[in-house]
Amino acid sequence: MTGMQMEFIRKMPLPQELLRDYPIGADLKRRKAERDAEIADILTGKDDRLLLIIGPCSADREDAVLDYMRRLAQVEAQVRDRLMIVPRVYTNKPRTRGVGYKGMLHQPDPGKGEDLLAGIIAIRELHTRILRETGFSCADEMLYPSNYSYLSDLLGYVAVGARSVENQEHRLVASGLGVAAGMKNPSAGDISVMMNSIAAAQSPQEYIFRSWEVRTSGNPLAHAILRGYVDNFGRSHPNYHYENLRELFELYGEYQLANPAVIVDANHNNSGKRYLEQVRICKDVMHSRSLSDDIRGLVKGLMVESYLEDGAQKVGEGVYGRSITDPCLGWEKSRELILRLAEYE
């Protein structure tokens, strides 16, 4: 193609072709719809349970992720009257320099090269197996907006990351999603960028999507995710403290957005990627909720990076259930945290 330095490797299947070849049955569709409604009720204040989005930084291998999900389902049964658990199953990962492991979408086997056709099948099969075997519909990051259609019948929650939140395509596509969309504050920390992103996602939009001109009605479930930020010198700063939450509450009023809500990401720059800090940060946020009805009403949930083993490893080191991207809280600590969060009033 003229003017492009690209090798066109192969044509990818259309979303409707993949959904036809790898379908889900009526029972799974019904289960997802039930969970979608529960998430919506939490974000709109009809359900006062806490939303807990928890799971690996990256879903790197099917066996370990499914092992984690089965354990999570057992704990969820003990706390479902107080918490709604939405597993993190992030199958594509942004990379600061564009190199390194980019997730299961790119590399279904982290030890082998990139294969996006196999990857798009692998991530659909993974989300399907989790829904079928545990009843969980999951959260994933919308890194590539046009790929959302491959998983649109499976995902219960979508996050727009710190690197993507300023991008117009991400904002416009988020406005057309039928599920909750969390918009993270950008890496540099400008909260107005996040608020403008929420405003765009909540508004009706027209744009080009997968070769179609489309029109949306806006997504009233678009909301904030606070994940900390980095300053001009690359130093991490948190934004989960009471005063940050109070400021966000006031901003929601100024912007006059629907359904004021925030999820606090306990890792990333809020923890300075010191993954063990996530436990303390979650407790701090829960304490802030107890101090103010405004903050309690605003903070709808928490996001935690958690896997089977503590910490992180390099690709190829081979420790089962240990993250190959950001360090995560191990299973026992995660289980204890979930049970503790369920005790808060």
Positions of predicted regions on the chain:
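Acidic (Asp/Glu)-rich catalytic clusters
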Residues: 43-46, 73-80, 129-133, 216, ...
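Internal helix-turn-beta structural module
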Residues: 307-345
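Glycine-rich loop at the start of a catalytic domain that most often binds anionic cofactors/ligands
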Residues: 62-74, 97-105
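Active-site-facing alpha/beta catalytic cores
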Residues: 2, 10, 82-247, 268-273, ...
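Conserved, mostly hydrophobic/aromatic
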Residues: 55, 264, 330
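N- or domain-start disorder-to-order transition segments that initiate the globular core
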Residues: 2-44
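Conserved phosphate/anionic-ligand binding catalytic regions in large, soluble enzymes, centered on
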Residues: 51-64, 326
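Long, contiguous binding/interaction regions
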Residues: 29-32, 60, 133
